[in-house]
């Protein structure tokens, strides 16, 4: 399945998802999908910086995986949004955002969408 098909599937899984992007493990964006009517909170440079930070954090977690187990996802709650980063295999990372009012049931929708890809 292509990156664009994966992004479409994830975005369709839950209307509360605002933003989805897939990048490689160097932080290079491979594809992005933004919900219609949503204005990103970060500009392109800030988004790139956030991706590099998330990728580097994921690499650190990978070093600890022998003791902690494989990283499934990282969930961060901010005042203005929630963010999930999730490895896709060993080469890619998925980053999703949604509003801070969203309940955790969104995880099941995302996981189900990724299982179909």
Name each model feature, range by range.
Residues 1-117:
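Non-catalytic interaction/Regulatory regions outside core domains
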